[in-house]
């Protein structure tokens, strides 16, 4: 009853594309129906309380199944969920329903959520990014080029004062941002409050010297939501422009709370995706990163890491650009060659700046400006701090390379 090939999808339905690998002997339709049932109203037996509700109104439906080209016994199952199954404005509830129990299902050898279509009616219940791309540019007064960042290394072990010094050196050399590593929270060698104070000092000093607005992603991620908010409040009191959160390890509920605070208080929010590969690396099980990226845009963040296409981490170019567009643009056409399974209309929800980071350095600059365009943050960790003359010359090298590439592109040269 959950496999309904003649179903016409509604504009308000949440649509999901699952890559299903059934156990031997299980027909694909059966597997698709099982996914739809288990992630909506079904249970393993018929219960008398089914008669007290309208299953037709509330059940998920598998409405299309297609074999995956070049893979044996793998199918894409399309499932439509009625909007009423989900709590408004809760990414947490959306995921609990769609990817909750069903991934441990016996009839399936493996299951991967490839894409979600978020209908405008549901998207409108989310605040989305605290500020978005345009507001960020206006706050920073930086236009017509990608922004430059750098993660402070060594990520663990520096004292707060030396950490602030490293931040200052990078920023005075010409970077726009520096970043706490995702593992930097509040450890014995550097407590968060000390770090925040020294970094704020570095920011204002670099700003005064260069005449440009500078930021450092102060990581507010913590063991409890209360502690996280305390750090965010302290950052606001210091007058810094941006803070940071690890949204997968911190959780969507915490992230959404933080995003609301950031919008109310004029803070930009940088999002790191630590733990994403646990979920998205396997080709036939888990969740594709484009789903995690869409979820982040709904939950709220102004920057998110997306890999590089050229550095040390995995990522295919077309597919990466597919979810980069899903983060930045308002309306994205379905395009299977880029992994976009559904046309997505974000109805004016602010966009998220993609952050390219991971093993990139100055030689990659032409490729990066070409691939990511102006609306991006290019983040060079070792690619700045690894400069033989130090942080500031490393920062200068990156800024000069970026300005040169942008100028060449604007003159119509091929990078």
From Swiss-Prot:
Cofactor: Mg(2+)
A family per Pfam: RuBisCO_large
Free-text cofactor note: Binds 1 Mg(2+) ion per subunit.
Subcellular location: Plastid, Chloroplast
PTM annotation (N6-carboxylysine): residues: 179
CDD domains xrefs: RuBisCO_large_I (cd08212)
Gene3D superfamilies: Ribulose bisphosphate carboxylase, large subunit, C-terminal domain (3.20.20.110), RuBisCO large subunit, N-terminal domain (3.30.70.150)
GO MF term list: magnesium ion binding; monooxygenase activity; ribulose-bisphosphate carboxylase activity
Binding site for Mg(2+): 179, 181-182
Post-translational modification: The disulfide bond which can form in the large chain dimeric partners within the hexadecamer appears to be associated with oxidative stress and protein turnover.
Catalytic class of the enzyme: lyase
Keywords for this protein: Calvin cycle, Carbon dioxide fixation, Chloroplast, Disulfide bond, Lyase, Magnesium, Metal-binding, Monooxygenase, Oxidoreductase, Photorespiration, Photosynthesis, Plastid
GO CC list: chloroplast
Reaction(s) catalysed by this chain's protein: 2 (2R)-3-phosphoglycerate + 2 H(+) = D-ribulose 1,5-bisphosphate + CO2 + H2O; D-ribulose 1,5-bisphosphate + O2 = 2-phosphoglycolate + (2R)-3-phosphoglycerate + 2 H(+)
GO biological process: photorespiration; reductive pentose-phosphate cycle
SUPFAM superfamilies: RuBisCo, C-terminal domain, RuBisCO, large subunit, small (N-terminal) domain
Listed InterPro entries: RuBisCO, RuBisCo_large_chain_AS, RuBisCO_lsu_C, RuBisCO_lsu_C_sf, RuBisCO_lsu_fd_N, RuBisCO_lsu_N_sf, RuBisCO_lsuI
Catalytic residue positions: 153 (proton acceptor), 272 (proton acceptor)
Subunit structure and binding partners: Heterohexadecamer of 8 large chains and 8 small chains; disulfide-linked. The disulfide link is formed within the large subunit homodimers.
Described purpose of this protein according to its UniProt entry: RuBisCO catalyzes two reactions: the carboxylation of D-ribulose 1,5-bisphosphate, the primary event in carbon dioxide fixation, as well as the oxidative fragmentation of the pentose substrate in the photorespiration process. Both reactions occur simultaneously and in competition at the same active site.
NCBIfam families hit by this protein: PRK04208.1
Family, similarity comment: Belongs to the RuBisCO large chain family. Type I subfamily.
Note: The basic functional RuBisCO is composed of a large chain homodimer in a 'head-to-tail' conformation. In form I RuBisCO this homodimer is arranged in a barrel-like tetramer with the small subunits forming a tetrameric 'cap' on each end of the 'barrel'.
Name under which the protein is recorded: Ribulose bisphosphate carboxylase large chain
Organism: Cibotium barometz (Scythian lamb)
Gene name, Swiss-Prot/TrEMBL: rbcL
């Amino acid at each position: 009853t959950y496999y309904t090939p003649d179903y016409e999808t509604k504009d308000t339905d949440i649509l999901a594309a699952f890559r299903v690998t059934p156990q031997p002997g299980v027909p694909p339709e059966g597997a698709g129906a099982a996914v739809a049932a288990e992630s909506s109203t079904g249970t393993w037996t018929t219960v008398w309380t089914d008669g007290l509700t309208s299953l037709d109104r509330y059940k998920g439906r598998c409405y299309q199944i297609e074999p995956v080209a070049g893979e044996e016994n793998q199918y894409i199952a399309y499932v439509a969920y009625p909007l009423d199954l989900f709590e408004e404005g809760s990414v947490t509830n959306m995921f609990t329903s769609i990817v909750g129990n069903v991934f441990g299902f016996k009839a399936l050898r493996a299951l991967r959520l490839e894409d979600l279509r978020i209908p405008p009616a549901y998207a409108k219940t989310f605040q989305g990014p605290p500020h978005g791309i345009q507001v960020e540019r206006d706050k920073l007064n930086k236009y017509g080029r990608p922004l430059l960042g750098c993660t402070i290394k060594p990520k663990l072990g520096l004292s707060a004062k030396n950490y602030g010094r490293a931040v200052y050196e990078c920023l005075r050399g010409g970077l726009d941002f520096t970043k706490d590593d995702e593992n930097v929270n509040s450890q014995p060698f550097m407590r968060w409050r000390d770090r925040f104070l020294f970094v704020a000092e570095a920011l204002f000093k670099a700003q005064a010297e260069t005449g440009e607005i500078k930021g450092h992603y102060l990581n507010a991620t913590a063991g409890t939501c209360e502690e996280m908010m305390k750090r965010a409040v302290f950052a606001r009191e210091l007058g810094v422009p941006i803070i940071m959160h690890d949204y997968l390890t911190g959780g969507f509920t915490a992230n959404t709370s933080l995003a609301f605070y950031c919008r109310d208080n004029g803070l930009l929010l940088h999002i790191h995706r630590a733990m994403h590969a646990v979920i998205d690396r396997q080709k036939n099980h888990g969740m594709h990163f484009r789903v995690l990226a869409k979820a982040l845009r709904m939950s709220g963040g102004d920057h998110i890491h997306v890999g590089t296409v050229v550095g040390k981490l995995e990522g295919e170019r077309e597919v990466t650009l597919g979810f980069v567009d899903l983060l930045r643009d308002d309306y994205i056409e379905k395009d299977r060659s880029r992994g976009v399974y559904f046309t997505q209309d974000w109805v004016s929800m602010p966009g998220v700046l993609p952050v390219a980071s991971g093993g990139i350095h100055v030689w990659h600059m032409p490729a990066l400006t070409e691939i990511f365009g102006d609306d991006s943050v290019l983040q060079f960790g070792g690619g700045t701090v690894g400069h033989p003359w130090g942080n500031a010359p490393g920062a200068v090298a990156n800024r000069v390379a970026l300005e040169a590439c942008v100028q060449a592109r604007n003159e119509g040269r091929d990078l």
